[in-house]
Amino acid sequence: MRVQDVYNVIYTHTEGEPLCIIYSGVPYPAGSTILEKRAFLEENYDWLRKALMREPRGHADMFGVFLTPPSSRDYDAGLIYIDGKEYSHMCGHGTIAVAMAMVANGLVARDPSGLTRIRFETTAGLVVAEVAHEGDRVLWTRFENVPAYVAAQDIAFELPGYGPLKADLVWGGNYFGIIDLRGTSLRIAPENGSELSRMGLIAREEIRKKVKVQHPTEAHINNLNFVTFWHEPTIEGCLYKNVHVFSAGQLDRSPGGTGTSAMMAYFEARGVIGLNQPITSEGLLGSGTFEGCLIGETTLGTVRAVRPTVKGTAGMLGTASWTINREDPVDAGFLVL
């Protein structure tokens, strides 16, 4: 055992979905863009991602974010999202949580009005959050996400045991393959987690075979990582219940922030909802909701897109100062799949 560098983190959850916020210990190159910062992490600090996301400090479903300095005065901070397997372009449950944590822990100056605005730089684009607070209480976050759009509809594929289905490919900060489970026997519930995970990975591979993924304006965004299953809600007043399957088969416990953005674009394209029509989304656990709204139209290059906002709340779980022995293969992080 020897003295190691120390990395300070904050732990939160958003409707059950965890977040490890890594806010110290990484010497990002001065003046670097968010893409350059991610490349720097991938080349020099990917071991830190693995050590904090994986066992013994994390677990198979841990999610995290590197909270970085801004690259210019146009932003207040940068967000680089991670899990035990890879990096994500954006994360809504994470944005809700990190914005509230920044206000609660003094990482950003509070606006005297009780509504603090934070401009985040992500690898998906600009995300603007507003955090409500009153006295020593931090109440909620609402953020305007990057523009969302439907890239493809009615992608036919076969899901073993559940017959022929169709998926829509939708961008909402990440690309999602959205699949309607109504009419099948597969239900979205924690007790069906293993089956949902297995079917999500199969569906993702089938969709990847059928469509080429490429963002209209961001050349670096060309991957499908998320599959969303949805059916009727179990909470009164919700438009739907869904679960997002991603990376190595992890299940988002929350309704999903980028997922709610994609789902609103999906429903708007099919005429189910309109602009400026608030909706409520239900997640895997059936115990909490997000509020969403499409506040307008825009374009991504020549592609029509919509402007999603998502509102939710997160809870503080604790803080930690981690030391990591990179010479110990167990201490450096491992996964049991």
Curated annotation (Swiss-Prot):
The active site is at 91 (proton acceptor). It comes from the Bacteria. Disruption phenotype: Cells lacking this gene loss their ability to grow on t4LHyp as a sole carbon source. Substrate binds at residues 92-93, 252, 257-258. GO terms for molecular function: 4-hydroxyproline epimerase activity. It catalyses: trans-4-hydroxy-L-proline = cis-4-hydroxy-D-proline. Pfam families: Pro_racemase (PF05544). Induction: Is up-regulated when the bacterium is grown on t4LHyp as sole carbon source. Its EC number is 5.1.1.8. Keywords: Isomerase. Belongs to the proline racemase family. Catalyzes the epimerization of trans-4-hydroxy-L-proline (t4LHyp) to cis-4-hydroxy-D-proline (c4DHyp). Is involved in a degradation pathway that converts t4LHyp to alpha-ketoglutarate, which allows R.sphaeroides to grow on t4LHyp as a sole carbon source. Displays no proline racemase activity. This is 4-hydroxyproline 2-epimerase. It comes from Cereibacter sphaeroides (strain ATCC 17023 / DSM 158 / JCM 6121 / CCUG 31486 / LMG 2827 / NBRC 12203 / NCIMB 8253 / ATH 2.4.1.) (Rhodobacter sphaeroides).
